[in-house]
Amino acid sequence: MSWLNTKKASCWRSSGRSATKSVTTNDAGTGNPAEQPARGAKQQPATETSRAGRDLRAAIVVGLSIGLVLIAVLVFVPRVWVAIVAVATLVATHEVVRRLREAGYLIPVIPLLIGGQAAVWLTWPFGAVGALAGFGGMVVVCMIWRLFMQDSVTRPTTGGAPSPGNYLSDVSATVFLAVWVPLFCSFGAMLVYPENGSGWVFCMMIAVIASDVGGYAVGVLFGKHPMVPTISPKKSWEGFAGSLVCGITATIITATFLVGKTPWIGALLGVLFVLTTALGDLVESQVKRDLGIKDMGRLLPGHGGLMDRLDGILPSAVAAWIVLTLLP
């Protein structure tokens, strides 16, 4: 998620992609005068889009639908939250794996998907120990699995026997993915286990949403000073200020009424959630720049892939779990 909700990945790799052919237009704006609509003909209204070229109507409908489902789950059947996190882990992991493989990385898919489910579901009986055990086992299996994928990508050695090609870069990308999605998701699952767990999930989610909305609105209206132009040119310091104001305000309210914390603790939590949301967004923006893509997927109309919505939520979930564990 981003303050401007615009994640624009440039710097495409020089991989032989052909440039998009341009069409010479006349004054009417069409490529062929014969194809111009007849005068007085009824034209379809243009779809309303954001500055990122997304369908705003679809984005709002999808966002509200997901929000209503999550609210119902957390209020009436909070333990189903773990199943939702498990499904999100599966989908988001698959999205990133597909993008990495498109970029030439050889990623062990099966152990990542199974290990991710283990990391999430083992939190139910064992808590953080189960999450770390599932994560550790997943990493070990992935490292071994990649060794036996050497027939697909090999490099000659001086002795004549093939050796795994790009093993280090592939395993590094795999471990990064294992931390980024399955491990972070497992901390999100653990938020719901305490007695007031649903309140903590609401507090974290509302803080992230308020940060995004506030940053987007202020950035669009007043954004002039780029924050990190080499990673995300659309983000501005003005937008970040809007994120801070809205995120802190929302967290003070939710922390006070949902989890019973004092306003000053709510303010500190708000700062923490805004920072983790911003860092998560920047990390995904950098990953997409490295891969030369705009979105991780197309699952959610108007949003992109599921991972494009989880980028700020996942590190915020880790931060929320740490605070929940340490605070009395």
UniProtKB/Swiss-Prot annotation:
It comes from the Bacteria. Signal peptide: none annotated. GO terms for molecular function: phosphatidate cytidylyltransferase activity. Its EC number is 2.7.7.41. One of its GO terms (biological process) is CDP-diacylglycerol biosynthetic process. It is found in: Cell membrane. Its main location: membrane. Pfam families: CTP_transf_1. Residues 15-29 have a biased composition (Polar residues). It catalyses: a 1,2-diacyl-sn-glycero-3-phosphate + CTP + H(+) = a CDP-1,2-diacyl-sn-glycerol + diphosphate. Keywords: Acetylation, Cell membrane, Lipid biosynthesis, Lipid metabolism, Membrane, Nucleotidyltransferase, Phospholipid biosynthesis, Phospholipid metabolism, Transferase, Transmembrane, Transmembrane helix. It is an enzyme of class 2 (transferase). The keyword Electron transport does not apply. InterPro entries: PC_trans. The chain crosses the membrane at residues 58-78, 81-97, 103-123, 124-144, 173-193, 202-222, 239-259, 263-283. One of its GO terms (cellular component) is plasma membrane. Pathway: Phospholipid metabolism; CDP-diacylglycerol biosynthesis; CDP-diacylglycerol from sn-glycerol 3-phosphate: step 3/3. It is a multi-pass membrane protein. Residues 15-50 are annotated as: Disordered. Belongs to the CDS family. This is Phosphatidate cytidylyltransferase.
